[in-house]
C-alpha cells in the first residue's frame, strides 16, 4: 500500500520479511515513473509523480530503524513522532508500534 500525509499502518506487516516485500513492491511501482499515484490512505492532496511512494518508502525505512533501536513501542513511537512532527493519524503509529514490538497481538 501507499500512504501520504499520515502515519503508515504497519500492524499487518509484522515481520521484517513482509516489510521488505512491501519495500520491493514500492520500488517496482516507482520504476514505472508514474505521473501520479493515488495513495490508498492519505490526507491532503497527494503529490505528483512518485512522491507518495517515496514518502511511504522513507517512512518504512525509518520505522524499521526505530524497531531495531528500541525494544518497546514507546521508543518507536517517540522516534517516529520526532521524525514526522505533526503527521496525522498517530493512533496508527501507536497500534502498529505495539504490534510490531510484540506488546499487542493483532
What do the PLM-derived regions correspond to, one by one?
Residues 69-106:
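C-terminal regulatory/interaction regions
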Residues 1-55, 59-62:
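Metallo-beta-lactamase
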